[in-house]
Amino acid sequence: MYQNVYFDGRSIHLWDDKLGYRKTPYKRYAYLYDKGGKFTALDGTRLKKVFRYDKEDENLYESDVIATTRTLVDQYTDSDEPSVGHRTMIFDIEVEVTEGFPSPSKAENKITAIALWDSVTDEYYCYILDPENKLEIESENRVLKKGNNTIIGFKSEIEMLNAFLGKYCEIRPTIITGWNTDNFDIPYLYNRVYQLLGQEFAGLLSPIGVVKYSEYRQRFEIAGVSSLDYLALYKKFTPSLKPSYRLDAVGEDEVGIKKVSYEGTLNELYENDRKKFVAYNLNDVHIVVELDKKLDYIETSRGICHIGHVSYEDIYASSRYLEGAILVYCKKIDVVVPNKNKDARKLMAQRAREDKFAGAYVQEPQKGRHEWVFDLDITSMYPSVIRSLNISPETKIGKVVGWDSKEFIKKDNKKTYTIEVGGKDKGKLTESELKEYFEKTNVSISSNGILYRMDKVGLIPAILGKWSDDRVQFRKLAKQFNDDGNEKKFQYFNRRQYLQKILLNSLYGVLGLPVFRFYDIDNAEATTLTGQELIKFSKKITNHYYNKELGTDEDYVIYIDTDSIFASATPLVKARHKGIDTNAEVIMTQHILNIANEIQNYLNQSYDLFAKRFLNLDKHYFEIKQEVIAKSSLFITKKRYGMKIINEDGRKVNKTLVKGLDTVRSSFAKGMKTLLSEVLEDLLANVPKEQIDKRIFKFKKGMKAMDYDDIASPTGVKRLGKFIKNVDERNFQVMDKNIGGKLITTYYMKASPVHVKASLAYNDMIEYYGKKKYPKIVGGEKIKWVYLKQNPLSLAVLAYKGNEDPPEILQYIKEYIDVDKLYNQALKKKIKMFYDAMGYGLPVDERYTLQRFF
C-alpha cells in the first residue's frame, strides 16, 4: 500500500510499503461518448477511454481527476488498508526574536534550537546553538545523553543545521508533525537552510530533493514526506471551539502537560538559563507526542485518506477523500463518473456571499426548567433519508414545482402540478393524475418535490449502505476482540468503525458543496428538507401519543434539534402512578425508560405511514432510538440548554450535558464560566433563587481580588489591519495622550470590534514602553482583553497575549482593570438569560433589601 505520492507535472513519484520508491511517467486519460464503447457512465452513456483530448471539451468524463488520486485509485483499487512501515518525526524549532515575530518567509533570525522525537526509537533530540557552552557539556563532541534525551550543543548555526539534517536523513521520516509546523516551523526551517546552506541542503528534507510551495494548499509540499500539522488536525477533529489553541492550553487540557514556564521573553530564557531553554524546547515536542498517543489523529487521518485513496495532506478537504472513495467504488463496479462543474469555484464564492441551502429544523424550546426529560434521536437521519429516497445524481428524474405533501393528501385538493425535467417545463398533472403516477411508477418524492427512480439503487445510497454495513461489521468485531482480550485487534477494528462513522456523517454535507463532483443543490435540499419533515412528523406523533392517553390537547415536545426530540415523561408517569414520589430516582428512571421505549416503538411503527403517505415509499431506513434521561433540564433558547443526565443508553451515569451555553463557550472568561456552571447546577437542582443570588453577588464582590486572567475575555483576532485609519481620514476615534514626552496614539474606525481596539492599544503600548523585543498582536492570534477604568493613557480597553507580554502592560491591566464593567457587559447579560428562562427577575443583593432586618 502507498505511503506517499507526489506529482511533479510529468511523473508520478510513489512510495510503497512493500515495493519502495518508484518513478513513472504519468499518462492522463479521460472518457468520451462512443456508441460502441466498452465503458459505461453513471447515467448509462457508453464511453471509450481516450489519452488525447481537448481539456475544454464539455463532454469529457473523469478528465479532471487529479493525477495523484487517479494513480492511487487505479493502482490500489482493491485495498483501503493503511500502509505500514511509517516513521513519524515530531519536531519544534526555536527562533531568535529581535523585533516582532519572526517571518517564516524571510527567515532572517537565527534558529537557536531544534527538538525532535523519532517514533521508531522513541528517542528525543535537541540541537542547540550554544557557542559559549552555557550548558556545560563536558564531552568533546558536546553531546549529553540523559535517558531517551540527547542534547547536542553547537558553536554555530550552520554547524547545528548540518547536524540536524544529518539526523533527519538518518531517520528519513515518512510523516512529520508538530504544533503549527505548516505555518511556521517548516517554512522557516526550509527558508533558513536555503539562505545559509543553499538549495541542495534545503532539498534534503525530501528523499528526492523536491520541496515546493503549493498554492492550492497554501504551504510547503515535501515530496515523499507527509506533513500533518497537529494543530490543524486538532482543529479538524475536535468538535467544540477551544478558548485557546496555544500548545500550552491544549496540552494542559488534553494530557495535563503545560509548557515549561519562564519569566520575561524566550530570548531572555535562552540567554540566562539555557538548560531550562532546552527543557522548554523538548517539552513542546513531548506534549505533541502525548497528544497523539491519546487522540490518535495521525492514524485516523491515514485511515480516512486510504479509504479515499488520496495523499495524507488531503485530510483537511472532506470533498477530496469522499470523492476518492466514490471513485474507487465506481471503478470496482465499472462505472465512469462525470466531470465536476467547471464553475465550481465561482459557485463557492457565490455561496459564501449568499445564504446556504436549507438546513436542519430547530424548534424554539419551551423555556425553563423541566423535570424527567428524555430524548429520541433518529439514527443517522441524513444518510437514512438519502438511502430511503434513493438520492443520487443518476436517479434524479425531475421536480414537482410547488410541492407540498400535506396539501397534496388533503381530500379537497384540486391543484394542478407542473413537472420539470432538467429545469424545463415538461407538462402539468392534476392531483388525481399525479396520484395515479405515484401508484403506477416506482418513484419517490422528497419534501422539496424532487422525483427519484427506485428501480435501481443509486450510487450515493449504495455507498452509504456499504459504509453502514461495514461499520456494523467492524463494531461487532471490535466487541468480539475486546471481549476476548485481544487489545491490538480491538484497537484496529474500533478505529475502522470510527472511520466509517466519519465517512457516513460527512457525505451528505458535501452534496451541497459546489466543488464536490456530485454537487446538486436539489439533492442537498431534498436531504435536509425531508429530514425536517421527518422530525416534525415525529413531534406530531409524540404529541398524539401523550394527548390520546391524557385526554388533552397540548404540546408535550419541549424542544427539537435537527434529528432529536425532547419531552418530559412526568405527565404520563403522574397519570399512571398517582401520588408517586417524582424524586425517587430509581423508580422514576425505570418508568421513564418504559415510556420512552413505548413512544420509540410507536414512532418507528408510524414511519411506515410517513414514508408511504409523504414520500411514496414502500420501505425505508428511518429509525428512532432513546439515548438519555435527564432528571432535570434547563432550556434557554435554540441550541442552548443544559441537562442533568442520569441514564445514557440504558447505563446509569451522573453528568451535566451542556449545549451552546457560555459555560462551555471558548469566548467567555474562565472565572465567569465557573460561576455560570455553578448557577446552572443550582438551577438544575432547583436551588431557591435567593441562594443563587447570594452566590452571584459573592462572586461579584470577589472579582476585585481575582487574577485578571480569570475574568479577561478570550477571543481570536481577525482582520486587524482592516480597522486602522490614517489620521487624516474621517470617521475615526483618537486616543492621544502625551505622557512624559512620549506619544501613544491609536486610530481606528468607530465600528471597530472591541477586541480590535484592545489589540491596537496593546501594540501601541509596546511602542510607548519601547519594548520592541516583544512581538505585537497580529491577525489570527488568540488574545484576552479587559475593560479599563480611567487611566493616564485614556485607554478604554487593553489586550494581552498570555505569553511573552511586557510586564509593564500586565501591570497596567492589574492596576486599571474595570471589574464592574466586565461584570455588567459580560456576566450580567448571561445570568439574565438564565433567569429569564426561569421567569425570574434580576438577581437581588439581600444586603440592600429590607429582608435582612427580619
Describe every region a protein language model picked out.
Residues 268-406, 411, 486-541, 559, ...:
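Common nucleic-acid-contacting/processivity interface regions adjacent to the catalytic cores
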Residues 124-126, 133-138, 146-151, 172, ...:
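Active-site-proximal helix-loop-helix substrate-binding element of RNase H-like nuclease domains
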Residues 164-188:
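Proline-aspartate-enriched helix->loop->beta-strand connector
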Residues 91, 228-229, 368-381, 468-474:
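Conserved catalytic palm subdomain of right-hand nucleotidyl-transferase polymerases, strongest
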Residues 259, 535-562:
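Active-site palm subdomain of RNA-directed nucleic acid polymerases
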